[in-house]
Each structure stands twice: as C-alpha cells, then as structure tokens.
Amino acid sequence: MALKILERIFGDYSAKVVKRHQRTVALINSLEPEMQKLSDAELAHKTVEFKERIARGETLEQILPEAFAVVREASIRTTGRRPFDVQLIGGIVLHEGNIAEMKTGEGKTLVAAMPLYLNALLGRGCHLVTVNDYLAKVGRDDIGRIYRFLGMSCGLIVHGLTSAQRREAYNCDITYGTNNEFGFDYLRDNMAMHPQDMVHREFFYAIVDEADSILIDEARTPLIISGPSGKPAEMYYTFAKIAERLKRDEDYIVEEKEKRVAPTEEGIAKVEKWLNVDHLYEGENQQLVHYLNNAIKAKELFHRDRDYVVKDGQVIIVDEFTGRLMFGRRWSDGLHQAVEAKEGVKIEEETQTLATITFQNYFRMYKKLAGMTGTALTEEEEFRKIYGLDVIAIPTNKPMIRIDHPDVVYKTVKAKFKAVADDVEERHKRGQPVLVGTVSIEKSEYLSQILTRRGIPHQVLNAKHHEREAEIVAQAGRFGAVTIATNMAGRGTDILLGGNPDFAARQRMRAEGYAPELIVAATDIIPSQDPEVQAAREVYLQYLKEEEAKCAEEAEKVRAVGGLCVIGTERHEARRIDNQLRGRAGRQGDPGESRFYVSLEDDLMRLFGGEMVQNLMNKLGIEDDVPIDSPMVSRAIENAQKKVEARNFDIRKHVLQYDDVMNTQRELIYKQRRQILEGHDTREVVLDAIAATAQSIVEEGVPEDVYFEEWDPSILVALAEDNGIPKGAVNVEDLKAAVEGVRREQEGREKLAKVIEQAAIRAYEEKEARLGAETMRQLERFLLLRTVDEKWMDHLDAMDDLREGVGLRAYGQRDPLIEYKMEAMEMFNNMIRSIQRDMVRNLFIFEVVREPQRPRIMIESGSQGAAPRQPVRAEGKKVGRNDPCPCGSGKKYKFCCGRAANA
C-alpha cells in the first residue's frame, strides 16, 4: 500500500528511466538516414573512427547514439532485423549496468548487441553469459555476424575447448559463453602451473542473459573443481539398508521446508545396535553420522523422476528450475553416493574440493555488470542489495493482449488434474493449442496417462525426452496441439502461433532421407562452400518458403480461437517462475490465455499456508471436485509465495555473508599465487618464509609458560632440522652465545629467532649457488605453487567443516556469523604459517631431477550451498571431427565448434 502511494507521488521508476531514454532513441532514429547512405566499407570503418574518438578523450556516452545507429544498420544488412525503439531503450539500460526486464519474444539477443559493441570499443573484452552451450553458440553465430561486419572479433567459450582455443576466444572483442565455463576458467587459471596455461582477461563488462536464473536461482551454486578423495563406497550401501529399516517420525524427523533430517534418540539407539558401536556421536564414529544423515535425506527428500532419473545405471540430476537433465553434475558431500546406494546402482568415488567460487562472488568481480530476463521485478530488492543492480521494465513493442484468468483451487490433486484434463479437452475440440506446465516428470506422465485414456493426442516434454525439446516446443503453437511440459519448456525457443516453419522444413528433409549432419550444415547461419551443402540449402529454402505460407495460414486459425493457452498445474515457490510459464503465450502482441490450477495438497500450499484454507473448506463441507474461486484463497497463495521468496532471499543473503569471508581469503591467496606465477621475485617470498619459520620454531621450542632460564637449546636444534634446515646449520653453541647476558625474555626469543633465520639463509644461499639463480627461482616457483594449492585445498575442507558446525554456537547465545569470521581468520593465519613452514622444509629437502610430470585429475562441479551440491565432471577426451559437438547443438564437431577452432 505504502509503495503504491509513493509511486503515485513520485511516479514509477522504470517509466521515468524509459521516458528519459526516449530522447536518446529519437537522436538514434535521426541518424538512421545518414547510416543508410553509407557503403558497407564506410559503415564498417565507423568502428575505427569511434576508437580514434575515444583515444582523443570522448566518452562512451557521447558516442552511444551514433554507435547504436551503426549497429542497427549493420543488423539490417547482416541479419535482416531492425531493432525496435524499445530494443534501443533496452540496450541503453544494459550499457548503464542495470537489469532490463523484457518480455518473452521481444528480442533480447539482438538488444545485447548494441551495448556489447559500444563497450568493446575500449578494447578490454566484453562477455555475454548464457545458461547453456547451445544458446551461446546460436548467439555467437547469429549476432556475431553484426560484430564481424563492423570489424570486431567474436569468440565462443563452450565445453571441450583446449586452453589455446579458450585464450583465443577471451582475446576477442566480444566473447559468448556459459556461466559455468566462465567460472571454471577463472578457477582453472588460479590452479595453473604456468602463465601460458591462463586464459582469462580482466573482468570488465558482462551481460547476463536469463539473469534471474543465473544470478538468483543459481546464486547458491558454488562452482567446484575437485579430485578423488579415496573414501570407501561400501558404507553407503550399508546405510541405505539401515535407512530403509528406520521409520519416519519415530526414528528420525524430517523438516521438508528446511530440507533437513535429524535422527531421534530411538533411531540413534537402533543404529548403534545394528552397527555394534557404543556412541555414534563420539570419536571416530562421528563419520558414521554423515553417512546416516545422507542415507535418510536420500530416502525422504530426493525422489526418483522428480529430483533425479536413473538412466543407463546412473543417477542423473534433474534441474529443479528448468527440468533439464544435468548430465555430469553430482551432488557433493556424499549425497549423490547415498542416492546411488538407495537406487542400487554403481557408486562413483567421492571427491575433495580443490577450488570453488559461488556465482554471486564471481559476477561481482566485473567492473560493470548488466542482465536481461523476462521476469525480474519480483526479485528487484535482491538484485539491488546483492549486486547493486536496478531493474528497469522495458515496455513491449506491441501491446500485451493475453488474458490471465484467476486461479482455480481444488481440495485434492486428483480433482485438480481431472479439471485440467476437462479444460484441455474442451479447448482441443475448438482447435486452440494448449501448453500445460507441470513441476515434475512424475506429474507430467500422470497427466499424460489421463489424456491418453480420453483419446487426446499430445506431446510430452520432460527431462526424459530432452533430445526433442526445441522441436516439441517450437510446434506447440500449431492448431489443436496439446503439449505437456515440465519447467524446461520456454527458455531459448519461441512458440510461434501456427507452428515454426524452420522446424517443419527440417522435418521434411529428414523424411526424405537427408543425413542429419547435412541438414545441420544446410540450415547453418554460416554459408558453406561445399556443393552438396549448397544443394541441400536450396531444398531447405524452398521447403521453408512453402512451410511459411502454411504456418501463416494456420496462425490465423489459431488467433481466431484465442491463441495459445498456457495452463499451470501448480504454483511454483517463486512468482517469477509462474510468470515465465505465462509468458509463453501472448508474445509480440499475439492473443493468448493463461490459468493456474491449484490444489491444497500441492507442496507450496501444504508447506506454506494451505492449512487455514483446508480447515475453512472442511467446515463449509466443500466437496473435493468443487472449485473455489475466492479472494481469500488467492491471497493465501500469493502470501505463501511471498513467504517462500523472502525465505529464499534470506538464505541467499545469509550464504553470501559467510561466503564473503571465504571470498576475501580467496582473493588474497589467488592474488599472491598470480604474482608468483607471473614471475614476481620469489626470493623475497622465501626469505619472509624463513623469517616466519624461525619465529615459529622459537615459539614452539621456548613456549611462554616455560621460564627462559630453563629452555633447552637442543630442542630448537631438533625443531630446526624437522623444518628442513640442514643438519649442523643450527647448533647449540650459537644459540647459547646469542642469549648470553640477555635479561628480557622477549629480547632473548628475538635473538634466538635471528640465529636460526641467519643459519637458514646461509644454507639457502649455498643451495642457490650450487643450483644457479635461474634454477633456484624455478624450483621456488614450483614449490610455492604446489604448497599453496595443497594448503588451500585442506583449508577449503576445514572451512566447510567449520561452516557446518558453527550454527550450533547459537545455542550458547553466540552469533554464529561472528564466530565463523573469527575462527576463519585464525584458520587462515594458521594456513599462511603452514605454507611458509612447508615451503622452507620442501625447499631444503627437494633436489632438482628431470622426471615426466604426472597429470592432475580434476573434476569440475557446480553445487548449491544451502541446497545439495551438484558437481559437473569434465572429460579430457579429444573430440573427433565427425563426433557430436560437445556444445550440445546436435551437429558434428566439424560443422560446429570445430569450424571456429580451425578458422
């Protein structure tokens, strides 16, 4: 209410921004006739002219109108598309470092071209971040034509590229890629052993496509590079059997809202008896608690065909936001192994973290960050507080005429799905295309069975049928089409009324026996010189023309019956996910409808607010199959969603507070590591380490609780030798002589440390003279990098353990976050001291020998901090020319990324 009053007084912020930018748009439009007169060469030369003007002191803001006008004209000449005025406004919003909320079908891909071109004029590299390899490649190939026409290079970062290919892509003016690949490259750079292995440039400017998905949904998802930990797999099978024997609410408690489980006293007693151990929570047995909790979580919180599927003997995660199968990703902390044990499939080895960063901290490294999405306003506060980004709603090019019907609420799931089937059947008879959104594979298959029994032809799109995703979604707007889809339906593929002529033309070519790779090459944006491909392209263009005529005719029939109808079978936790589903209908001014069917047995209502409504319905004696349409129920649903959104925001904010501590430490370690890698003077680092080691030897050998007169010099000699200082370098006589006549204990300790330090430096200089300065620097660099990596890896594990246990401090009336910060700093300081001591020890012990280097085994992963982690495994196999391209486009490598690699 207060917000509405403020809006009436001060006006809507987005509307003010849009109005302000309309003056710039008018200026861009006034330049259009001038741009149209330029030849291709003259238009392309504008890039050189802009760079010269910037070198003379002009700002990007001064150049913006002309640069946008140039990109608009280049787009017309290369892609045949002219950016609308609202797209120009979106481009300005992105240049200013904001989130542009643009509805589905409004051409976000083209919008990004203008600010990317403008910022790339500075020569510092700009990134366009997408959610998958396919969209990154389509963007690079399609919009990349504009950049190349204007004399700018455009690179692509996808899975399966070599370091050289990645470095080349990053050195381009503009680079398209996925959030995972950008993040992993950053981590890999900070694990590199040679400068030439590093690929990233500076973090200058990035536009994040589907910003809500990457910056909000995956904000708690750490990217993890990990290696084998060597833990046994048998225990997971043992505890899977134990979990099956335990009873819910009697032997353990499940908190579904928090996704937590806790064994009861009765349950613990049973487990101790079955395992024949005395105390489950003491000593070495504590590791068993980890196995037990994971086994119970796997049993109660992770369900087959909802959270994962079992395919070819493997447990494959289903993305909760998109419904896609996440091949190669694994939950960490032993959870994936527990699910594998529950399903009785082969358990893969557990891993240990080598390097990690969350998307929140990765994207906050950019000097300027912007984003595009169809749904962001509901998360406006989070974008502003976490990333410092304002959300600006961009008006649609044509008025939105979609009809959004009020929710229909039923008591039971069964009654709800019957009503959905009735609605689908009635619309199907009229020929109106229907897209039904479900929240899980299980629900989509349940509805499919109902429609099959009624004889309604339909397509099912879920994680089990992901291979045909784009094809099924593209034809969901045909006359009479019925499509059932999980959340994956939507992003990346437009639903055109009357069907998609491009997909229809491809289908005809497949039916006539054209090879799949030939169809891919013939329909590629990049023209081919191959005569066979050119002939196939002629056929494709002919079929495309015919299908366009058919689809246009069918589109009119669909518009006459109301356009695409979107039916949601359940409200999602976040309103924006519901809005994404609604947004599939009514694109670009098309007619359309949407309606949500809800039951009080749905997870959202069951966990977050359906009890009051349930009690009211029971008191009124409302039957299961009688729908409710009441403002009170609608408010209850909206309040439940707001409650969950606020809770999830708090979780992400809480995670960030903890991760900021780790982030500060990460930046310090990576900065020092990079300096070593780039050839900074390692001798100074070693001398500092020797001084620190000498100090720690004295602290250990002459502790403060020992009278100085009672100290034993032989202990210091032994400690010096334990720390790698050559035997005889430190002797008892020198130590005694150093403190002779000293009265103050502190002064005595300082003198002892100086004796040990000088002895170590003499030994160090002798080794340097023997090996030569250059070899010594190489040895130092290698040992420093190796020691830092090993200690950092151990530190990550220790910080994870601290994070898991620190919450219990709240029971002692202590703030867990403050406790975490204090202990984390102490642990970090201990790690630095440990690095210094190990470095000194190894430097004296190691001798230079020529030996082949063993490859490091690495696994890349993404995970969720508060939610279970989801690692991604990286295969090191070389891709053959005729193999399927690893980017997921469906093309052969030689027709896809291989073309860019060999260009």
Swiss-Prot record:
InterPro entries: Helicase_ATP-bd, P-loop_NTPase, SEC_C_motif, SecA, SecA_CS, SecA_DEAD, SecA_motor_DEAD, SecA_preprotein_X-link_dom
Compositional bias (Basic and acidic residues): 872-881
GO molecular function (one): metal ion binding
Enzyme Commission number(s): 7.4.2.8
Binding sites annotated in the UniProt record for Zn(2+): 885, 887, 896-897
Membrane topology designation: Peripheral membrane protein
Tagged with keyword Acetylation: no
GO cellular component annotations of the record: cell envelope Sec protein transport complex; cytosol; plasma membrane
Cofactor binding notes: May bind 1 zinc ion per subunit.
Binding site for ATP: 87, 105-109, 494
UniProt keyword annotations, A-Z: ATP-binding, Cell membrane, Cytoplasm, Membrane, Metal-binding, Nucleotide-binding, Protein transport, Translocase, Translocation, Transport, Zinc
Compartment annotation: Cell membrane; Cytoplasm
Protein family according to the UniProt entry: Belongs to the SecA family.
Assembly notes: Monomer and homodimer. Part of the essential Sec protein translocation apparatus which comprises SecA, SecYEG and auxiliary proteins SecDF. Other proteins may also be involved.
Protein name: Protein translocase subunit SecA
Native species: Symbiobacterium thermophilum (strain DSM 24528 / JCM 14929 / IAM 14863 / T)
UniProt gene name: secA
